[in-house]
Regions:
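Acidic/charged coordination and interface sites in well-structured regions
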Residues: 88
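A short, small-residue-rich loop immediately preceding and capping a beta-strand
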Residues: 141-163, 174-178
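Catalytic or ion-coupling anion/metal-binding cores of large enzyme and transporter domains
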Residues: 1-68, 74-78, 82, 91-110, ...
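N-terminal small/polar loop signature for handling phosphorylated ligands or for N-terminal nucleophile
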Residues: 107-145
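Contiguous domain-boundary segments centered on the initiation and propagation of an alpha-helix
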Residues: 131-138, 145-150, 455-456, 462-466
């Protein structure tokens, strides 16, 4: 089918907007590609240092036999359940490389933090900027410059965007991303959320809450809700940077190792394209479409702006909004529905979604991927024979229409994310998880300086009414733009009581957040004299996700005359002290706004 006119138009304006930086980026790639291989180009001492730690046979291959050498960048640690399976991946990949006459080295490791561990703590204020630390660590790893290809081992929220940003700065290298897959299903996400809401009301204690949380998060692999980590995997499939169909295979399955080995084969294959060529404006648009069609994480309205910039491309929220108006919602996965990602995979998974979008003219088909068979390869399901040989089978109809629907009969005719703008600035809302009767909320404001203040007001019973909770001083420059996911249970309790409730903030919410209408990423942020600094208790605020507006219903003269508030001195000082936050002062000081991707490296 012909490409949808809106996709064509959005892609064309991104191409035009990005002409100068993209040309400079590609010129840099061409210059890097024309050089001799590292082991031939570097001095003898450099080469000796580079390969001194290798087994003897590998040294012979890479130096004397001029074998191709893969650089592995790993985000392994066993703090993250999603990354624990990565521990032994380098050994598997090295073995597979040797089978094909090549070598592989762990070029370096990057940090990986778990937002589930740091939610509601000072550590969460390092979260967003850890993406750029990961990008820098990826660049440091690859800066040894003795690699002919690269493999990126990572899964979670900031890790994949950080690895991708770093890899794009070495965009002349063929690069494949290697995931670990989701943990098997435990306590359902809906049941877990109900226990959290009961705990917020004091109806259950710590022991029962811990039991529920441990039953939900019970083993190795990605969390099973469709948050930022699993959205990462969907977007990598849509961009053709995975082995096809590898996103949601559980860590314990035999198929998982077969796919991991195939990543090494793919990156060594003759003609595997450089990642900087794969990630062009068409691939970025494909990722945006996949995000919208699945109701993915709002965090990617920040992260993929940064990813695009790393490839010399400029996108903005208007591009997302234009696409959202024509991209249908095809998936209902928690928090957008009851199913988890294992049920999503069983119903047809990413391959089903990509096939439906391609057939509807809602994705670019003329793109490069790490598969020689192009993007259509990602519409098939991998299977392994007894001898571990891989093949890919066609995906039929959705096996569960409560989870996945065809483009001709979607859950919604439009995407799961919306742009909001008005006299409070520009922000975004994830509507796919919000009941339709809550898409418009108009109520008096209650202004908070911290999420702890909101929690205290809830516990004191001060919010048992229609209310729009404004939580400010949560932007990139204020305190690193933490996720405020801990606010979901109390706000959900208020909504469950029948009150019309919404959140407005310059901070972020987790990819797992939903249910309660939340205007997030509001920019300019309050610390930059953004409009949220003018809001006062009692101002009536209207959040309208139908019309795409976000306004304080205050007359223009009064609004203009208000002097923007400043954060309390005590809070301003506390935000930068302790728990390593001092080390990120330069990041906060230099960060642009959320819509610019909060890219501290520009």
């Amino acid at each position: 089918m012909a490409l949808h006119a809106t996709l064509d138009a959005v892609t064309a304006r991104i191409r035009a907007r990005s002409a100068e930086p993209r040309a400079a980026y590609l010129a840099r790639l061409d210059a890097q590609s024309r050089r001799d291989r590292g082991a031939d180009r570097l001095g003898c001492a450099n080469v000796a240092h580079a390969f001194a730690g290798m087994p003897g046979n590998d040294k012979l291959r890479v130096v004397a036999e001029r074998a191709r050498n893969i650089g592995i960048v790993t985000a392994y640690n066993d703090m993250l359940s999603a990354h624990a399976p990565l521990q032994h991946y380098p050994d598997v990949l090295k073995d597979e490389a040797r089978r094909h006459g090549a070598t592989a080295q762990v070029a370096g490791g990057v940090p990986a933090m778990c937002d589930g561990v740091t939610q509601g703590t000072p550590g969460m204020e390092l979260s967003l900027f850890s993406r750029d630390v990961i990008a820098m660590a990826t660049a440091v790893s690859l800066s040894h410059d003795v690699f002919d290809a690269a493999l990126m081992l990572g899964v979670c929220d900031k890790i994949v965007p950080g690895l991708l940003i770093g890899a794009l700065h070495f965009g002349h290298l063929p690069t494949v991303f290697v995931p670990a897959g989701p943990m098997t299903s435990g306590l359902s996400n809906s049941a877990k959320a109900r226990v959290r809401e009961r705990a917020a009301q004091g109806l259950v204690g710590r022991a029962e809450l811990l039991q529920a949380e441990s039953a939900a998060y019970h083993g190795q692999g990605t969390c099973t809700f469709y948050g930022t980590a699993n959205s990462n995997q969907m977007l990598l499939e849509a961009m053709g940077l995975h082995v096809p169909g590898t996103a949601f295979i559980n860590p314990g399955e035999g198929l998982r190792e077969a796919l991991t080995r195939d990543a090494a084969r793919r990156v060594l294959a003759q003609g595997c394209p450089a990642i900087g060529r794969v990630v062009d404006e068409r691939a970025i648009v494909n990722a945006m479409v996949a995000l919208l069609a699945t109701g993915g994480s709002t965090n990617h309205l920040i992260h993929w702006v940064a990813v695009a910039r790393a490839a010399g491309l400029v996108i903005d929220w208007d591009d997302f909004a234009a696409l959202s108006a024509v991209v249908p919602l095809l998936a209902r996965v928690y928090p957008n529905g009851a199913a988890d990602v294992n049920q999503f995979q069983a119903a047809g998974g990413p391959g089903y979604v990509l096939r439906e979008l391609l057939d509807a003219g809602l994705m670019h088909e003329d793109v490069l991927t790490i598969s020689a068979d192009g993007i259509r390869a990602y519409t098939r399901l991998p299977v392994a024979a007894a001898d571990e040989r891989l093949s890919w089978d066609p995906i039929g109809d959705s096996t569960d229409l409560d989870v996945l629907r065809p483009a001709a009969a979607p859950f919604s005719a439009t995407g799961g994310l919306r742009l909001l703008q008005g006299n409070l600035g520009r922000g975004v809302i994830k509507v796919s998880a919000v009941p339709e009767d809550r898409h418009v909320v108009e109520a008096p404001a209650r202004v908070f300086d911290t999420q702890a203040d909101l929690q205290a007001a809830f516990q004191a019973g001060e919010l048992d009414r229609d209310v729009v909770c404004v939580v400010r001083w949560q932007g990139p420059r204020a305190n690193g733009m933490p996720e405020l996911h801990k606010l979901t249970p109390p706000l959900a309790v208020l909504q469950g009581k029948g009150f019309r409730v919404a959140l407005v903030t310059d901070g972020r919410m987790s990819g797992a957040s939903g249910k309660v209408p939340a205007a997030i990423h509001v920019t300019p942020e309050a610390l930059a004299d953004g409009p949220l600094a003018r809001v006062q208790d009692g101002d009536v605020i209207r959040l309208d996700a139908v019309q795409g507006t976000l306004d304080a219903l205050v007359d223009a003269q009064t609004w203009a005359a208000r002097v923007p508030a400043r954060p309390p001195v005590s809070m301003d000082e506390a935000n930068g002290v302790g728990w390593g936050r001092e080390l990120f002062a330069g990041f906060r000081r230099n960060a642009p706004g959320a819509e610019e991707g909060a890219c501290t490296w520009l």
